[in-house]
């Protein structure tokens, strides 16, 4: 039976189309809105974000002239880096109008013979062959019911030697949680409800076995998994510190309510990563 899937435009735009100026108050200059990788302890946030992008792209065996699909491309930092470092063609997918506009301007200013496109659409509608796929911090938005379709689409899009790098926040299974001594507290339940209602509507965190199960079901092999758990705690700490330092501007751009909401989100999530209630992993998938 054919299933017609419509991308979650509303859920994504509710978060990412808040205001580019607001996000600039706490993100680094590349506007990378995902876990950084502090390869060295003395790295700035910007250096650590580029290190994370390099870590992801370095797992894809990119070669000049290949076409890289970036699913959930954000403000385009990964595609820019891929063009500059690996000399590839890029296609970015985003459901955010603000992000699509920002990326298009960036592309227009780049001096490269490589093709570069940003599409205001989801992976659900994408049907072009590409050589490699990267997806950083987008899988969390898809919802459990779409996992099978996501892996089907990405597997079909790639060639026989294709690779995908999937970077996503994950949660422990109940068994893993018990083994770690994690308990389900009222505080955790309330914070989770807050995140799903006010920050990432429609969001859902997979477990590591879930990613394996759905990826392998369509023919992918998961050849590597790398955790960046404490790197995300540090990233969130730095975002919260930057937002707090720009409190007056944040309130002027948005409101006291939005500022308070984001401080609660950033500090609360940092705590979850430190305690092990959440993790973030890079999965290398091969056909």
Curated annotation (Swiss-Prot):
Q: Which subcellular locations apply to this protein?
A: Cytoplasm
Q: How is its activity regulated?
A: Regulated by PknF. Inhibited by S-adenosyl-N-decyl-aminoethyl (SADAE), thiacetazone (TAC) and dioctylamine.
A biological process (GO) of this protein is: mycolic acid biosynthetic process
What does the UniProt PTM comment say about this protein? Phosphorylation by PknF at Thr-168 and Thr-183 regulates the mycolic acid profile which affects colonial cording, intramacrophage replication and abrogates the PMB.
Q: Which GO terms describe its molecular function?
A: cyclopropane-fatty-acyl-phospholipid synthase activity
Q: What is annotated as the active site? A: 269
Q: Identify the pathway.
A: Lipid metabolism; mycolic acid biosynthesis
Instruction: Report the gene knockout effect.
Output: Inactivation of pcaA does not affect initial growth of the organism over the first 3 weeks, but after 6 weeks, when wild-type organisms persist at a constant level indefinitely, the pcaA mutant is progressively eliminated from the animal. Cells lacking this gene accumulates a hybrid mycolate with a cis double bond at the proximal position in place of the cis cyclopropane present in wild-type alpha mycolate.
Q: Which residues carry this modification: N-acetylserine?
A: 2
Q: What is its EC number?
A: 2.1.1.79
Q: Which UniProt keywords apply?
A: Acetylation, Cytoplasm, Lipid biosynthesis, Lipid metabolism, Methyltransferase, Phosphoprotein, S-adenosyl-L-methionine, Transferase
GO cellular component term of the entry, any: cytoplasm
The record's listing under CDD domains reads:
AdoMet_MTases (cd02440)
Pfam families linked: CMAS
Q: What is the main EC category here?
A: transferase
Sorted alphabetically, which SUPFAM superfamilies does this protein's record hold?
S-adenosyl-L-methionine-dependent methyltransferases
- Catalytic activity from the UniProt record: a 1-acyl-2-(9Z)-enoyl-sn-glycero-3-phospholipid + S-adenosyl-L-methionine = a 1-acyl-2-(9-cyclopronane)-acyl-sn-glycero-3-phospholipid + S-adenosyl-L-homocysteine + H(+)
Concerning InterPro entries, the annotation shows: CFA/CMAS, CMAS, CMAS_actinobact, SAM-dependent_MTases_sf
Which sequence positions carry the modification called Phosphothreonine?
A: 168, 183
* Annotated function: Involved in the phagosome maturation block (PMB). Catalyzes the conversion of a double bond to a cyclopropane ring at the proximal position of an alpha mycolic acid via the transfer of a methylene group from S-adenosyl-L-methionine. It can use cis, cis 11,14-eicosadienoic acid and linoelaidic acid as substrate. Cyclopropanated mycolic acids are key factors participating in cell envelope permeability, host immunomodulation and persistence.
Summarize subunit and interaction data from the UniProt record for this chain.
Answer: Homodimer.
- Would you identify the family this protein belongs to, as annotated? Belongs to the CFA/CMAS family.
The protein depicted here goes by the name Cyclopropane mycolic acid synthase 3
Q: Which organism is it from?
A: Mycobacterium tuberculosis (strain ATCC 25618 / H37Rv)
Gene name of the record: pcaA
